[in-house]
Amino acid sequence: MPRFALKVEYHGKPFAGWQRQKDQPSVQGAIEAALARIEPGEHTIAAAGRTDTGVHGLGQVAHCDLEKNWDPFRLSEALNYHLKPAPVAIVDAALVDDEWHARFSAVERQYLFRILMRRAPATHDEGQVWQIKHDLDVAAMQAGANMLLGNHDFTTFRSSICQAASPVKTLDELRVERVQGLSGPEVHFHVRARSFLHNQVRSFVGTLERVGTGAWSPEDVKHALEAKDRAACGPVCPGHGLYLARVGYPDPVFSSDRV
């Protein structure tokens, strides 16, 4: 059975997360239903990461095994036709080796988090940003973010229901920048690592937002990390500002990755 990699984009608002759930809409469920329309039968896809309720995908990657040796372009076109009207799109597809795995072959994952700073309701970006009414000190947040770089025990920044065998991870990048969005000034967090703990990125952002307001100092972030105690974490920010932006592999998988 040929195996295909799929690059997936989705708006997380109508879904209870990526993972298939009974009686709840999910991104995985939507794609598997579309697969059943082009090849009757039950299909199970595997993904590079299982995003939570409300979290978006810009470059999620999944794989599926099919009976037919599809042309990758025609496969993506067929799936997009049957995915309508769900806010899910297959933006690229590729034939891969049988042993290639969307999750286990990945060597890095990149997340983007968006904060919109404005008082008026965000009509166009509603559900796609974490909106706050106050300004943030980006330099202070970057100083706090720098405390988290490298290999650490991130117990403070993982959820109590995290199933990872170890809280030790290596954080390769946590970059904070101010940008001018269409709806107003935004702060973007660019986060990169091989893998993440459950709620790790949202815990980082919620904690750094406290630094940006002046409620915490950058050194407080270091103290929280060293505490190795979930109670030392700042607030966990909402999921709807979070995007799985990119998944990296040792060799380019999709034609769009080679451009």
From Swiss-Prot:
Q: Which GO terms describe its biological process?
A: tRNA pseudouridine synthesis
Question: According to the UniProt record, which cysteines are disulfide-bonded?
Answer: none
What is an example of a GO molecular function annotated in this UniProt entry? tRNA pseudouridine(38-40) synthase activity
Q: Pfam families from the xrefs?
A: PseudoU_synth_1 (PF01416)
Active-site residues (renumbered):
D52 (nucleophile)
Q: Which segment of the chain is annotated as a signal peptide?
A: none
The top EC class is isomerase
Q: From what superkingdom does this record's organism come?
A: Bacteria
Query: What reaction is this protein's catalytic activity?
Result: uridine(38/39/40) in tRNA = pseudouridine(38/39/40) in tRNA
What Enzyme Commission number(s) apply to this enzyme? 5.4.99.12
> Entry's CDD domains?
PseudoU_synth_EcTruA
Instruction: List the NCBIfam families hit by this protein, alphabetically.
Output: hisT_truA
Q: How does it assemble?
A: Homodimer.
Q: What does the sequence similarity comment in the record state about its family?
A: Belongs to the tRNA pseudouridine synthase TruA family.
HAMAP family on file: TruA (MF_00171)
Q: What is this protein called?
A: tRNA pseudouridine synthase A
